[in-house]
């Protein structure tokens, strides 16, 4: 059931910050003999690499993203434009991991600036990079493939401001940064909220929805207007204080019919539904999950697959009736720490599992009906993002 894996091991071991990994650095990449039409690309946060998996076979090719041998690049999420053979990857340069019970203890705590890297899809060679702010979170392409959006999950900023005391919560805000996808020119930036992470755009690319982990809100960004004006929608009546969330929204997912936005919450351990027409969350549509909800995907307009942690698992949720239709757990030798679900154009479903952040993580193909694993690929350490070669 497990596919073969080729490539480097944990290249992040004993690595330092990204201070020496200058913006002019590139990497050679390597030959990838998996056709793009059947390939998926997975960022490996702990092993500084991208795994390419053959969705119709067993092959896995792991390509290093080492800009500098002593830097821990920590690729975190990616977006693909197959038409221009481009891959955009956020490089986080996190601090050295300390012994902690929290497997994500280093996430959002970097002191060094991050980077947005553009790679060649054919070889995964790094062609160019641009500085972003500390702790880049999500990276997405607009549907017209003209702009790249980068959020910043900067909990360190929030904690530093809180420790000083007396400052306005707005000084904790991290930015949404927008680049031209063609030439990597920075088009603008806007402070949006405390520790923004998941972002999704409407099909017309006029609006972005940003999940704001550190301030318990969903921010709506007007991408069509100068300055990218924002409006804010709290997730509930009893938000946590800035930097200490009660709900902890991690991702925002737009339904295929674009009528609702689903926000998945870590601390709140639920999914919440925003009605786009009224710009209000619907309390009767909230679905408690009794586990941390990460980055889900829609199967249809009202059916959602949600990856869960603490306890680990996967839930299929009927949003129309606000209930869990099915729930599955996995043996630890198959999947540890489910992070993101992706649904391919052919309807096949994939689940990325972080693993223990040291040994290889995994990608599972999931049966839509039973939620049972159909196939497994071993990838690099701490995988946390996935995109398809035909996007």
Regions found by a protein language model. Name each.
Residues 1-8:
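Sec-dependent bacterial lipoprotein signal peptides
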Residues 10-391:
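Predominantly soluble domains enriched in secretory-pathway, periplasmic, or organellar proteins
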